[in-house]
């Protein structure tokens, strides 16, 4: 097999392959003979179809398969011998004017780039930290109490206030016509908790059971109901019942209902703190990991293989269509979505992936079995039966591969933080959790 390699662009290469026709024909004959043993054709007994008949019927398709296989094998061998790391699939075309007894192909493809990572000691990384405070524990307990609240009807004549559960009938009209979803009876919601539009809650707040009120309500431009978005409706609402919320006391009974073994408030707070600390750890790691990756990419020089970018765009496009389909959008799989919408994100992902892969290779940051086990144990710790979760992860290679990817990212994060110029910044628990 004759092979030549040519550089076309920064990452684009061309391999010219010449294969002897005798080798191709020999393989075609061999496959046709195997096919003749099993092929069934009218007028012939199984395995007794003459070779010339088999060749006439299947010769073209078998020759096509053999050419594909032989060229693919030759390309893989040539790329390997030339130490070329191929990115994506090659574009293979047959050349005219091949020497007698030969068939010649051009394979045009891209290679993965050389990744140059600069001096990480000059990289600036802001590393955040946060603590679980008593206030955070108190807030979590309040949330747990709200989840277990009960309601009792208020005395007649008592106005509705924030935290109350109200039962109402309402009807909204736009230009005198009731619209879809604009009418309901015995509808319940909690006042002041954002379950309804602010104007609706403001109108109901202060009303008493048995009272009715009319008021205008302007739907926001970005309202999810497209038929009413940006329009103003006239509402009639009647309050039928007002119920006050009663939160359980923070005591042994609450602790036991939440599964605290010793049934003490101290045990409850300790359990909440442990869970919050686990969540804080994961969120801090995610935030700091993002800062590290941005710093790492800023110190790297590389060209992006278009084949890898296009493949990533295709994945993002497929994900977007799947999301539209899940939302109930009709013909989501045929939706016209411009590829360029995803190009910046695809380029970032490909660039980061190549840089991380090079750092891992150059510094042996691969996940060890001990690290995998420790990470899975940590993930399983928050479940009722951790041992079942551990078995679930280790029982599937794909799930374990996802854990391995996370551990490698953690190794990269620790490596860069050890080398870079790190600025420590303490933030509040609420800021980390994205709470106001």
From Swiss-Prot:
Keywords: Cell cycle, Cell division, Chaperone, Cytoplasm, Isomerase, Rotamase. The keyword Zinc does not apply. GO terms for molecular function: peptidyl-prolyl cis-trans isomerase activity; protein folding chaperone; ribosome binding. Gene3D superfamilies: 3.10.50.40, Trigger factor ribosome-binding domain (3.30.70.1050), Trigger factor, C-terminal domain (1.10.3120.10). Coiled coil: none annotated. It catalyses: [protein]-peptidylproline (omega=180) = [protein]-peptidylproline (omega=0). Its EC number is 5.2.1.8. It is found in: Cytoplasm. Belongs to the FKBP-type PPIase family. Tig subfamily. GO terms for cellular component: cytoplasm. It comes from Paracidovorax citrulli (strain AAC00-1). GO terms for biological process: 'de novo' cotranslational protein folding; cell division; chaperone-mediated protein folding; protein transport; protein unfolding. This is Trigger factor.
């Amino acid at each position: 097999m004759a092979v030549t390699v040519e550089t076309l662009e920064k990452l684009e290469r061309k391999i010219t392959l010449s294969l002897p026709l005798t080798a191709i024909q020999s393989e075609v004959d061999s496959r046709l003979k195997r096919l003749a043993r099993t092929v069934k054709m009218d007028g012939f007994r199984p395995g007794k179809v003459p070779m010339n008949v088999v060749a006439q019927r299947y010769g073209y398709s078998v020759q096509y398969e053999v050419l594909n296989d032989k060229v693919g094998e030759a390309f893989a061998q040539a790329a390997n011998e030339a130490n070329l790391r191929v990115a994506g699939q090659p574009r293979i075309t047959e050349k005219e004017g091949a020497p007698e007894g030969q068939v010649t192909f051009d394979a045009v493809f891209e290679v993965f780039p050389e990744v140059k990572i600069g001096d990480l000691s000059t990289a600036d990384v802001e590393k955040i930290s946060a603590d679980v405070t008593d206030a955070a524990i108190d807030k979590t307990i309040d949330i747990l109490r709200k989840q277990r609240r009960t309601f009792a009807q208020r005395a007649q004549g008592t106005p509705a206030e924030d935290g109350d559960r109200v039962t109402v009938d309402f009807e909204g009209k736009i230009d005198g016509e009731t619209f879809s979803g604009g009418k309901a009876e015995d509808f319940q919601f909690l006042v002041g908790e954002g379950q309804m539009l602010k104007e609706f809650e403001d109108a109901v707040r202060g009303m008493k059971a048995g009272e009715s009120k009319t008021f205008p309500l302007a739907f926001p431009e970005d309202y999810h109901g497209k038929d009413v978005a940006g329009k103003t409706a006239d509402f009639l609402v009647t309050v039928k019942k007002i119920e006050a919320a009663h939160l359980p006391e923070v005591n042994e009974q609450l602790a036991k209902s939440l599964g605290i073994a010793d049934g003490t408030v101290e045990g409850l707070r300790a359990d909440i703190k442990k869970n919050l600390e686990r969540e804080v750890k994961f969120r801090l790691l995610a935030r700091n990991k993002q800062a590290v990756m941005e710093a790492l990419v800023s110190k790297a020089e590389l060209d992006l293989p278009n084949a890898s970018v296009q493949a990533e765009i295709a994945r993002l496009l497929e994900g977007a269509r799947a999301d539209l389909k899940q939302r109930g959008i009709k013909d989501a799989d045929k939706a016209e979505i411009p590829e360029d919408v995803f190009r910046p994100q695809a380029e970032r992902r490909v660039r980061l992936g190549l840089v991380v892969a090079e750092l891992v290779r150059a510094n042996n940051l691969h996940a060890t079995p001990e690290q995998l086990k420790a990470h899975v144990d940590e993930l399983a710790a928050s479940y009722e039966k951790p041992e079942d979760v551990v078995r679930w992860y280790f029982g599937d290679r794909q799930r374990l591969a996802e854990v391995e990817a996370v551990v490698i990212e953690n190794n990269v994060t620790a490596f860069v933080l050890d080398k870079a110029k790190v600025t420590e910044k303490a933030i509040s628990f609420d800021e980390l959790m994205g709470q106001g």
